Each structure stands twice: as C-alpha cells, then as structure tokens.
Amino acid sequence: MIFFVNEDQRKTSGSTCYLEFQKGNYNDKCWLPDSISIYCELWDEHNLSDLFTHVVKDFDYFGTTKISKKQWKEIVKLSKESHQIWQEIIAEADLWVKECFKEYDIFTIIGM
C-alpha cells in the first residue's frame, strides 16, 4: 500500500499520529490487527477531511466517525469526480472496505 499502513507497519513506525480505519463499531480499543491507518500529515496534506465532511456532516477528526455502506459509496463517487489524489487514496482503502463490508455494515474512523 502507498497511503495506508497495516497495524504492524504502524507499530514499527513508533507513531500514533494516524487515523485508524477499524472494522465495525469502535469498542474502546485502538490499533487492532485488522485495521488500516493513514498518517495524519498525509490526511491533512490532501485535505481528506473536506472529502469526508462533504458526505458525513458530523465527521470528527479528533473523535470517532461511523461510515455506512451508503456513505462509503458516496465518498468513492465524489473522490472520482474530484481530485485525482482523492481517487487514488480512496481506491486503496476500498479494497479493505469491501472486505469489511462482507462482515460488518459499518466501519469506524478513529481520529486523532
């Protein structure tokens, strides 16, 4: 992966400055083995909060945000209609999200 890291890679980095994509509902535990994460500076550099808040009005950069299947489809669509970099980042996450949605109806983004 180019934009996202798995939990082993995040742990090796020694940093917690990541937004974590976690399968299902957040249950008071971070950095799960099947999560993916994106470095906060990369998120900020590409203004990904703008993309997510366009679809998820209550997106919380510093808290937790649930993303439904319907919302994800809208995020994917908007990313394709907007910036090329958004499309690339979302396409990379989409592989993980599709696997998540086989088992769960939502995933949670755990912010800073």
Where in the sequence are the language-model features?
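Acidic (Asp/Glu-rich) sequence patches and key acidic residues
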Residues: 1-106, 112
